[in-house]
Regions:
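Hydrophobic/aromatic beta-strand patches that form the interior of the parallel beta-sheet core
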Residues: 69, 98, 127, 154-157, ...
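Short, well-ordered alpha-helices that flank and scaffold nucleotide-derived cofactor binding pockets
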Residues: 54, 58, 80, 84, ...
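PRPP-dependent phosphoribosyltransferase catalytic core
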Residues: 2-12, 143-219
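Active-site-facing substrate-recognition patch
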Residues: 1-64, 205-219
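Short, glycine/charge-rich flexible loops or terminal/linker lids adjacent to PRPP-binding catalytic cores
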Residues: 80-127, 214-217
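A contiguous pocket-lining binding segment that forms or flanks enzyme active sites
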Residues: 112-155
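Short acidic, glycine/proline-enriched helix-loop-strand junctions
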Residues: 62-63, 79-95, 169-180
Length: 219
């Protein structure tokens, strides 16, 4: 796994508010932390996303990537830009960009290729892109999906690895992340911010849902 948290990349994240600290955040996993990676702040700025995706594409030989796959929603943007920069370096042919979607009903929440995209996977070299790796669970689903359709996963390229996700967590696929952050997180019952009465941030993360659930529990 490549880690190169150089000052320029960290500054790009910080300048748009993509790394926020000194607050009390609740993650989608239910764990708490004082730091939050606000990936949505990046997507507001096409120039920043473009530059970051160029860096995400750099480690790969353009002719060796047939299709870039990203999970919805952020992965759609990333797959387009990364494929764009791979195509700029290709001498012939074209790198395609597709995305995987989750089932809409309450039973099927697994990723799937819709819109006929599955036809472009078999026997192809696939690069999977993701914005933030936390547990690797979503990306592992996409890896399994690509393999199910006969594709060969060359690598995973991410904006940020905040969960120390390793190749073994994602089907033994090499990981390249622009930045890697080792964030201290806590279960609710051991969270020092909860114990100190630090207000939960309701603007970022799952703070509002956490507070709503607490209120319901105390009714």
């Amino acid at each position: 796994m490549s880690e190169h948290n150089d000052a320029k990349i960290m500054k790009m994240f910080a300048d748009v508010g993509a790394v926020v600290s000194d607050s009390h955040f609740v993650y989608s996993s239910g764990r708490h932390s004082s730091v939050y990676v606000n990936k949505d702040a990046l997507y507001l700025h096409p120039k920043v996303i473009s530059e970051l995706c160029q860096l995400m594409a750099q480690p790969y030989k353009a002719e060796q990537i047939d299709v870039v796959v990203g999970p919805v929603i952020g992965g759609v943007v990333l797959s387009q830009w990364v494929a764009h920069y791979l195509n700029q370096r290709r001498q012939s042919g074209e790198t395609l960009a597709v995305f995987a979607e989750k089932g809409s009903d309450s039973v099927d929440k697994q990723f799937a290729f819709n819109r006929g995209y599955d036809k472009y996977i078999a026997d192809k070299n696939i690069l999977i892109v993701e914005d933030v790796l936390t547990t690797g669970g979503s990306v592992r689903q996409v890896v399994d999906l690509v393999r199910h359709h006969g594709g060969h996963v060359v690598g995973i390229s991410a904006l940020c690895n905040r969960g120390s996700v390793q190749p073994k967590d994602v089907g033994d696929v090499p990981i390249h992340a622009l930045i890697s952050l080792s964030l201290q997180t806590y279960n609710e019952d051991e969270c020092p911010f909860c114990q100190q009465g630090v207000p939960v941030n309701t603007e970022l993360g799952k703070g509002r849902a956490f507070i709503a659930r607490q209120k319901n529990q105390h009714k």
